[in-house]
Amino acid sequence: MALLTLEEAKQQLDIETTANDTELQAYIESLTAPIERHVGPIENRLVTEQLDSRGSRLALSQVPAVSLTSITPVLAGGLAINVAALVLDGDTGVLWRRDGQFFYGGPWSVTYTAGRGTVPPTINLAARMLLQHLWRTQYGAARGGGGADDYSVTEPIPGFGYAIPNRVLELLEAFKAPPGVA
C-alpha cells in the first residue's frame, strides 16, 4: 500500500500523459520511508523485536501498535508470558501486565502489528506535497513560478536536512511519533 495512488500523484502534479508513469511510481514508492520516519508506521506490518525490563512496563519501538501477537523468552529458562495477560496501549506502544506485577524472566522476543491500517487524509496530503517538492528537483515547478514558497527550503531541518518542506512537517505534526524510550 502506497501513501497515494499514481492517479492522485498525477493530479497533484497536473500530469495528464503516461510518459512519466514509471518514474513517477518510483517517486511515490519513495515517499513512505521519510514520512514514516516522522510519524511511525502507516502501513500495517509485522514487527519482531527483543525487549527486556525489570519494571512494570515494556515499550515497543514501533507505534502505533495495532495488536500483540506473541511474547516469548529469548533465553532458555526465561519466563513465558501469555499475551492475554498483557494490556497494550497502542498509541504509545506501552505494555503492562493485567495483574500489575513487574516484568521479570526476560529478555523476550515480542511480535506485534504496528501501523495505522489506512492512510489518514492529512498524511495523504502531506505525501502529495512532498511528492510535488521532490518532483520539482527534476522537472521544476509545474504550476506557476516563484521561489518564495517553502518548497525552496533554505534552512536544514534537524534530522531531515532539506528534503521535507516545513508545510509537510506541519501537516505531519498531529501524527508525530512519540520520543523513544531509553
Per-segment meaning from a language model:
Residues 1-182:
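Divalent metal-cofactor coordination and adjacent catalytic microenvironments
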